[in-house]
A protein has these predicted regions:
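An N-terminal, globular interaction/scaffold subdomain
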Residues: 1-74
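C-terminal structured domains
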Residues: 182-256
Length: 256
């Protein structure tokens, strides 16, 4: 509060055994400006100091069945999500606190007990945190299931011999094309190697059949041709790289 550039604002503080007391005494004419500054600063303080403790508390209380390492992963996902400026929940955190503080002051209160206010007067803000945390837990579970499935497929591939020497994938996001070792188009929907057992496990829209074919063909080498570099970090391609590992070769500049 000492950085506030307001005339006739007097600040004092006292430290007691279990808490610190900050007193703001404003004798200026623009009380609304003072309230704005006050709510702004305290809202930022709540996000900086209270929020990390609240999230850990809720994680230990409501998701106690995760071990320490798993909780740390969830917290990492949560911290990363706070950087997402397109998430309306993330953006609404500050506003929810600010409005609660302003309403509290307008009710005629002249003091704010920090812990009590955070625990009992921030229902909207705490609901946002609960929703964010639940979303992050769900994302963690999906990522864990995804990695477990990838590991199963890697084990399956490593324990079976290749049925094809080389397969080319011309990746177009939709309507991608598979070519055999002679660079002839593979009709995957009518191939003898098509086996629907993998289609129910993982879905990538139009790439379902391609993934299914590759998991049955088990090529010794998978050459992926990417005509558009923006596809390089595509989820489906990342999955293929994880599954087939050193069998994958990426081509970005050939004419096929």
């Amino acid at each position: 509060f000492s950085a506030l550039n307001l005339e006739k604002l007097y600040i004092s503080s006292n430290s007691f055994k279990i808490y610190d007391n900050v007193i703001l005494h404003y004798n200026g004419n623009d009380i609304n400006l003072f309230y704005n500054y006050f709510c702004n600063i305290l809202s930022k303080a709540i996000i900086k100091f209270y929020e990390p403790l609240k999230i850990k508390q809720e994680l230990n209380k409501n998701f106690f069945y995760f071990n320490h390492f798993e909780k740390e992963q969830i917290l990492e996902i949560f911290d990363n999500e706070l950087e997402n400026q397109t998430n309306s929940l993330v953006l609404n955190r500050f506003t929810a606190i600010y409005k609660s503080l302003l309403n509290y002051i307008n009710e005629g209160h002249h003091s704010v007990i920090f812990n009590g206010f955070c625990n009992f007067r921030l229902s909207s803000y705490n609901a946002i945190l609960d929703c964010l945390l639940s979303n992050c837990v769900n994302r963690f579970l999906l990522e864990r299931e995804y990695l477990e499935f990838i590991n199963l497929l890697k084990l399956y591939i490593s324990s079976n011999s290749p049925k094809e020497s080389t397969i080319h994938l011309i990746y177009l996001k939709t309507n991608s094309i598979l070519l055999d070792d002679n660079k002839q188009i593979i009709d995957i929907k009518h191939s003898d190697l098509l086996n629907a057992k993998f289609l129910s496990d993982i879905t990538f829209s139009d790439n379902d059949y391609i993934l299914n074919y590759l998991l049955n063909a088990l090529p010794a080498q998978l050459i992926i041709h990417i005509p558009n570099l923006s596809y390089f970090q595509d989820e489906f391609l990342n999955t293929l790289r994880l599954i087939f590992e050193n069998r994958v070769c990426i081509c970005t500049d050939c004419v096929i």
